[in-house]
Structures are given as structure tokens and as C-alpha cells.
């Protein structure tokens, strides 16, 4: 909802939008709808087989009517982290906004909206922020006016025929998820006390431990560029096995939860050449242990025999 709010609230008919192959369907489908129903123009920066982009493509794709660059902070399939500061410098030099999907980084990766040049930051609460499902939000740079995606009850200005224009009420029609917000607040307090940098360092250490353990196993294909800093996920396939079957065996036989299939990232799977088979994604948390990582490596090795 929060991504749709930002996209629909800032893009007008005829506007040009630049996005990337790294995007989740929560970004892609709102953009596709704007293209189909409102005449928006879309361009996509391609990803290579490692999940990386050529930043010169952002400049190449700019047009006089480019309204915004809408992109993820990090891929939910390969963990590739985009250089948002570099993208923002290009976008702002052409008068375009920068709308960032931080679902994969909020809470587990340092984010500085001002330094990075982010105009609108969208995030979900149930991933790196460790909050309940059904929570999320938008951080909006001062001076940017987002049209409300929905209007209705607000609890204030009840005699007005129009929805309140002041933030945050303008984007908060209806009864809010109070329980979820309380849970997200508690999670944010924990993250603030623990430190995003400390969380990132531990998760990265666990991710690299797993990668080093599986990368040379015969029959295992690992996706992504591990020469660069990335988020704490590893996507792989085992021989020609269907990813759903591998995930099922990991769950039933080893008690390991993974995410198989397309990951709501169709363009990225096409770039990696995995559109037909999908992949098995391992995600590593601050609460995981090295012993659990080693058990996951052993499980992959056994399934690959």
C-alpha cells in the first residue's frame, strides 16, 4: 500500500518513470497499471547475470518528461544493493524525484535520506525492521506533496468535504493498525538500541559463512555478486531440481525455512536466466546462529548428492 501511495500520488499521465530489473512486483505492478491506464512511460535499467546494473544507463534513459526514478534499495533475490546516492545525483540533475523501496534494507542497512538524496522512502515493517506483518510507512522529504491514494475517515476536520491536507493525516485515511504500530515501535526501539551497523555486520557474517560453505558444492548454483557488499540473502539452485521441492525437503527434513519460486521478482529472474526454474532463497537474521548456518550448509550438501 505504501509503495502504491507514493507512486500513484506523484506520477501523472504522460510522465516518464525510470525503474530497474531488480524490482519487486509491489513496485512493478503499480507502474504497469499507470502505463496501461494513465499513459505513463516506463523505462527499465537492465541487470546483468550477476544482478548488477550499469549506472550510466540511468543517464542514458533520462527524458525531458522524466518525473521520477523508482527503484529498490536492494534486490530481494540476489541482495544486490544499488548506489542510491549515485542514482539520485543523476535524477536530480534532470529535475526528477527519487522514490526508493527500502523493504530489503530498512532496519538492517544504514540509510541516510539526506546524504543519499532520497525524496520518498517506502518501507515495510515485517522484514529488517522486525515488526508485525501489515505494517509499513513512507518517509517524505519536506516540500514534496503526495496526492492521497485513498480518502475517508480521519478523526479530524470532520465537517470538511475534503480529506485533510496535513501530513501524516493526508495519507492515513481510515482506522490505523494500532496493534501493529505498537509492535513496530517496539521493534524500532530494539534496533535503535542494538544499532543498525551491528545488525548488518552480524547478518553479513552469517551470510558469508553460508556462501563459503555452499559455493563449491557440486551441483549447486549460487546467484549474485559476492565481491560486493550485499544484504544477507543467498539464492541458489540444486542441480535441475524444482525449487519448490528443494524448499519442501529443507523444511520437512531439516526444519529450515526458505523461499522458493519467483520471489515476486520476474524481471530479475529473467536477467539471471532462472525464470523457468525459480530459485531457493536463504535469508539470514540477527537471531540466527553459526550452528544453524553450518546445519543449512550440510543440508544443501546432502540434497546435492
Model-derived features: positions:
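Pyridoxal 5′-phosphate
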Residues: 3-305
Amino acid at each position: 500500500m505504501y509503495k502504491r501511495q507514493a507512486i500513484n500520488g506523484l506520477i501523472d499521465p504522460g510522465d516518464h518513470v525510470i525503474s530497474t530489473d531488480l524490482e519487486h512486483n509491489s513496485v512493478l505492478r503499480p507502474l504497469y497499471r499507470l502505463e496501461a491506464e494513465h499513459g505513463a512511460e516506463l523505462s527499465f535499467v537492465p541487470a546483468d547475470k550477476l544482478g548488477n546494473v550499469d549506472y550510466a544507463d540511468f543517464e542514458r534513459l533520462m527524458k525531458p518528461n522524466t518525473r521520477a526514478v523508482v527503484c529498490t534499495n536492494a534486490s530481494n533475490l540476489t541482495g544486490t544493493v544499488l548506489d542510491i546516492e549515485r542514482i539520485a545525483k543523476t535524477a536530480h540533475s534532470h529535475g526528477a524525484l527519487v522514490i526508493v523501496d527500502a523493504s530489503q534494507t530498512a532496519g538492517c542497512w544504514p540509510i541516510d535520506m539526506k546524504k543519499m538524496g532520497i525524496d520518498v522512502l517506502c518501507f515495510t515493517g515485517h522484514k529488517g525492521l522486525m515488526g508485525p506483518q501489515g505494517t509499513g510507512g513512507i518517509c517524505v522529504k519536506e516540500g514534496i506533496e503526495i496526492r492521497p491514494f485513498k480518502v475517508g475517515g480521519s478523526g479530524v476536520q470532520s465537517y470538511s468535504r475534503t480529506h485533510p491536507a496535513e501530513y501524516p493525516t493526508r495519507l492515513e485515511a481510515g482506522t490505523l493498525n494500532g496493534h501493529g504500530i505498537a509492535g513496530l515501535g517496539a521493534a524500532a526501539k530494539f534496533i535503535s538500541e542494538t544499532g543498525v551497523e551491528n545488525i548488518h555486520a552480524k547478518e553479513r557474517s552469517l551470510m558469508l559463512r553460508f556462501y563459503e560453505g555452499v559455493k563449491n558444492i557440486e551441483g549447486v548454483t549460487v546467484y549474485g555478486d559476492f565481491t560486493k557488499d550485499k544484504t544477507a540473502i543467498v539464492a541458489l539452485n540444486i542441480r535441475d531440481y524444482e525449487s519448490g521441492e528443494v524448499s519442501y525437503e529443507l523444511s520437512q527434513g531439516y526444519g529450515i525455512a526458505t523461499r522458493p519460486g519467483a520471489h515476486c521478482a520476474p524481471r530479475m529472474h529473467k536477467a539471471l536466466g532462472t525464470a523457468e526454474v525459480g530459485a531457493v532463497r536463504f535469508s539470514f537474521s540477527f537471531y540466527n546462529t553459526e550452528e544453524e548456518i553450518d546445519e543449512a550448509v550440510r543440508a544443501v550438501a546432502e540434497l546435492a548428492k
